[in-house]
Amino acid sequence: MPKVAVGGTFQYLHDGHARLIEKAFEIAGDGKVYIGLTSDEMLQKNHSIDNYENRRVRLLEYIDEMEIPKEKYEITRLNDPCGPTVEEDFDYIVVSPETYPVALKINRIREKKGKNPLEIVYVEYVMAEDGTPISSTRIAKGEIDRHGKMKRESQA
């Protein structure tokens, strides 16, 4: 049964996050998805980002809406970008263009430890209606909503 890793801060659960999470569950099939959620410590007290527990609750609510059985996933605290993927056995890692370099680093570390590389599943950015990627930063700035719909005219 496949063991799939996906990770992020998940400040605002937007359509890009949804695509990553959905892809992870699709690949896992009868296996299990391990969702690494960035710890407060790793964020180095970035006050614009909600605390770990609030982000975890929102993530749990989102997965519950997907009607995924609790035994099919586990949310783990990420205290570093690689999390448990360098030590534990995983089959896949699902990444965005932003996190792809971390997956390459993980595989280099795994190789040095004599472990099999993870199969990297690359998921493209989800674009907002203006043709640029949906991101939590853009949502926080009030440019777009979680689905990429423009909220106001950008300042030129």
From Swiss-Prot:
GO terms for cellular component: cytoplasm. Its main location: cytoplasm. It catalyses: (R)-4'-phosphopantetheine + ATP + H(+) = 3'-dephospho-CoA + diphosphate. Its EC number is 2.7.7.3. One of its GO terms (molecular function) is dephospho-CoA kinase activity. The keyword Cell membrane does not apply. Keywords: ATP-binding, Coenzyme A biosynthesis, Cytoplasm, Nucleotide-binding, Nucleotidyltransferase, Transferase. It is found in: Cytoplasm. GO terms for biological process: coenzyme A biosynthetic process. Pfam families: CTP_transf_like. Pathway: Cofactor biosynthesis; coenzyme A biosynthesis. InterPro entries: Cyt_trans-like, PPAT_arch, Rossmann-like_a/b/a_fold. Belongs to the eukaryotic CoaD family. Reversibly transfers an adenylyl group from ATP to 4'-phosphopantetheine, yielding dephospho-CoA (dPCoA) and pyrophosphate. This is Phosphopantetheine adenylyltransferase. The lineage of its organism: Archaea, Methanobacteriati, Methanobacteriota, Stenosarchaea group, Methanomicrobia.
